[in-house]
Amino acid sequence: MKATTIERIEDKLYQNRYLVDTRRPHITVRPHRSPSPSLLALTQICPAKCYEVNEIGQVAIVSDGCLECGTCRVLAEASGDIKWNYPRGGFGVLFKFG
């Protein structure tokens, strides 16, 4: 009997490459004293886990591994919690498979 190998999403994401624009991040989080419900939701729903609650209780982003899927844009841009732009040409995610 042949053993079944389960592929993990982390292994697939590891294959992608990123060219990070350190001078101009494509996503910024609005300064806030306490995070809104939509910002807190981003810590759970971002497929690349780019959002996290920092040591002072604010939601911060590390966009280095961003997949540019737009999930955060749909959830939080209209409320003004984040500002989202496409990365400048040549920067951003470089997908390995497609």
From Swiss-Prot:
SUPFAM superfamilies xrefs: 4Fe-4S ferredoxins (SSF54862)
Presence of the UniProt keyword Isomerase in the record: no
InterPro entries listed in its UniProt record: ETF-QO/FixX_C, Fd_FixX
GO molecular function, one term: iron-sulfur cluster binding
GO biological process: nitrogen fixation
Pfam families: Fer4_ETF_QO (PF05187)
Swiss-Prot/TrEMBL keywords: Electron transport, Iron, Iron-sulfur, Metal-binding, Nitrogen fixation, Plasmid, Transport
Family to which the UniProt record says this protein belongs: To ferredoxins from P.putida and C.tartarivorum, ferredoxin I from A.vinelandii, ferredoxin II from D.desulfuricans.
Function: Could be a 3Fe-4S cluster-containing protein.
Protein name: Ferredoxin-like protein
Gene (name only): fixX
